[in-house]
Design a protein with these regions (language model features):
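C-terminal helix-rich "cap/oligomerization" subdomain common to oxidoreductases
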Residues: 1-4, 70-72, 224, 295-334
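Predominantly a Rossmann-like dinucleotide-binding segment in NAD(P)-dependent oxidoreductases
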Residues: 120, 127-210, 329
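Short active-site oxyanion
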Residues: 30-34, 69-71, 174-175
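N-terminal Rossmann-like dinucleotide-binding module
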Residues: 1-50
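Beta-loop-alpha module in the N-terminal Rossmann-like domain of NAD(P)-dependent dehydrogenases
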Residues: 39, 50-113
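Active-site loop of classical SDR/Rossmann-like NAD(P)-dependent oxidoreductases
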Residues: 15, 280-294
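Hydrophobic residues in well-ordered beta-strands that form the structural core
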Residues: 16, 56, 73, 96, ...
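Contiguous beta-strand/loop segments that form the cofactor/metal-binding neighborhood of enzyme cores
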Residues: 1, 186-261, 288-305
């Protein structure tokens, strides 16, 4: 087993600067080997800041590095699939920011390429690694809340992006729902062992101009087991404070984040059984990335089991149905 996993970071945008680079630069068992971005001065400045020796503007040059074990793909959404495929062709393990591809067929191509290369590809679903989510997961999987009948979730933010790839549907793949809603949908599916959806209804607030991404989306998904998932997201919300919520309703209790609050029926009464403990100083965002990246390093070092992200095929098929429903203004049956 190698003492340290040598990792290259592809893409030097906000998520790399806020999460991947600062976390990996201090992580035991990991070494930042190189950074690649088409903005060479930015890449060089970040390399100097985080003690990275090599910088590149071409992914193929980075992939030729000796003893490169893995890469983090943090490029614009439409580049995820080609960049992941290039890394796998070079026999390098991959952690890719979400979405893994712009559609389900793209994920299937990536899974097939990973199998051919005998390499691992993981998706950066950092929300699954949040401390409060892990606590909720223990209540759900332990059966303490009973059968889940509904999940209500939402994310309201004010993001005044005026230019760039995130505003163009062809490059971003979507707007408010893809960016804010899909992590909530993935979390709902993950907590319910990817229940089978049977119908989708969605309504969106369209962006301005042809080919623009949506500013908001209201989604309802009904599953074969009776579960209903409702999601409301907006990236143009003007209010006193931004809001993020995730609520589970079950036959013997309920739970809500954030912070995590859990109520169970005990002796015929609703009783607060929320886990206690001091809140950490670290934000949920950084804590989740630290846990996710530690897991990635452990998987590459073969200290933790590898699970191919086949569930992302099912996720993106639902996402495709959501957008179809919103575009055609009708319910879609699956």
């Amino acid at each position: 087993m190698k003492e340290r996993v040598r990792i290259g970071v592809i893409g030097a945008g906000a998520i790399a600067q806020l999460a991947h680079l600062p976390v990996l630069s201090k992580m035991r068992g990991a070494e930042l080997a190189a950074i690649c971005d088409n903005d060479r001065p930015k890449a060089r400045a970040l390399a100097d800041r985080f003690g990275i020796r090599d910088t590149f503007t071409d992914i193929e040059d980075l992939l030729e590095l000796d003893d490169l074990d893995a890469v983090v793909v943090a490029t614009p959404n439409h580049l995820h699939e080609p960049h992941v495929l290039s890394a796998l062709a070079a026999k390098v393990n991959v952690l890719c920011e979400r979405p893994l591809a712009l559609n389900a067929r793209g994920v299937e191509r990536i899974l097939a390429a990973a199998q051919r290369a005998s390499k691992m590809v993981l998706i950066a679903n950092n929300h699954r690694f949040r401390t409060d989510v892990q606590g909720l997961d223990r209540f759900v999987r332990g059966g303490e809340l009973g059968k889940i009948t509904g999940i209500r979730a939402g994310d309201y933010r004010l993001q005044r992006t005026t230019e760039g790839w995130r505003l163009r549907r062809a490059e971003a793949g979507g707007g408010a729902f893809l960016d804010l809603g899909v992590p909530l949908l993935d979390l709902a599916l993950w907590l319910t062992d990817f229940a089978d959806p049977i119908r989708v209804s969605a309504h969106m607030e369209r962006g301005k101009g042809a080919g623009a991404v949506e500013q908001g989306m209201l989604v309802q998904i009904t599953f074969a087991n009776g579960l209903v998932f409702a999601c409301d997201v907006a990236n143009d919300y003007v209010g006193q404070e931004e809001r993020w919520w995730f609520e589970v309703i079950a036959t013997r209790g309920s739970a809500r984040m954030a912070p995590l609050r859990v109520v169970k029926e005990l002796n015929g009464r609703a009783t607060d059984v929320s886990p206690s403990g001091a809140a950490g100083r670290e934000s949920a965002f950084i804590q989740s990335y630290r846990a996710e990246l530690a897991h990635f390093v452990a998987v590459v070092r073969e200290e933790s089991p590898y699970e191919p992200p086949a569930d992302q095929v099912r996720l993106l098929k639902i996402v495709e149905a959501v957008y179809k429903s919103a575009e055609e203004d009708k319910e879609i049956r699956l």
